[in-house]
Regions:
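DNA-contacting surface of Y-family translesion DNA polymerases
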Residues: 1-128
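Acidic, metal-coordinating catalytic segment for phosphate/diphosphate chemistry
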Residues: 103-209
Length: 209
């Protein structure tokens, strides 16, 4: 569990990276099967098909992964209180892997978790070609657990939750790609490509047939 994930990736490829994520409590079970949580966190990782050097493209992939794992949280009836990202750099980039996390109020909201992942990435990423990437939501609690803030509108929060539940139901019936953001058409997006893959490469995609 204490091994450097970048070294594991170089030595063992995708399997090495998966071993690191599983050692840290990350489960990448396929979402088309009913999920029963067995670990302290849910996550998604992938080795990119090429070096990603543009910040907006790296962020795009992270946000796609955050959405996929948020769906899994709701399916498991859990909320996360810890958001973490992992970036493994290219062999051409002499940088150690970037690992960053932050505590948050309990959430299973796609919109909220995407914002947390985006903020964490923008705060910590300082450049460099990225070749492997991961998102993890840890320290899970039951979805019934609520924390209310004076700065939040409960009505809007409830409407957002209902919207995401409706989207989940549509994807359960017609597949993950039934509802997608226009950003999947942008260069660097991985959602469509990964929808046809199996195993660890497609871990985290919901309802892929």
């Amino acid at each position: 569990a204490q091994a450097n994930p970048e070294i594991l990736k170089k030595e063992f490829g995708v399997i090495g990276l998966q071993l690191w994520f599983h050692a840290h409590g990350i489960d990448e079970s396929k979402l088309s099967r009913p999920y029963r949580t067995k670990s302290k966190g849910l996550g998604n990782s992938q080795v990119l098909p090429r070096d990603y050097t543009q910040k907006d493209q790296i962020e795009l992939v992270l946000l796609e992964m955050a959405e996929q794992v948020a769906i899994r949280l709701r399916r498991a009836h859990k909320k996360t209180t810890n958001v973490a990202i992992y970036l493994g750099f290219s062999r051409e980039t002499p940088l150690p892997s970037l690992q960053a996390s932050q505590k948050i109020d309990p959430s299973q909201s796609t919109a909220e978790l995407r914002r947390h992942v985006q903020t964490l990435f923008r705060q910590r990423y300082q450049g460099g070609a990225v070749r492997s990437i991961g998102v993890r939501f840890g320290q899970l609690v039951d979805e019934a657990y609520q924390v209310y803030s004076l700065f939040e509108d409960p009505t809007l929060k409830h409407k957002q939750a209902r919207l995401e539940q409706t989207m989940d139901q549509i994807r359960d019936q017609f597949g993950f790609l039934a509802i997608q953001r226009s950003s999947i058409l942008l260069e660097g997006s991985r959602t469509q490509e990964r929808s046809s893959l199996v195993g660890g490469h497609a871990g985290g995609l919901d309802g892929i047939q």
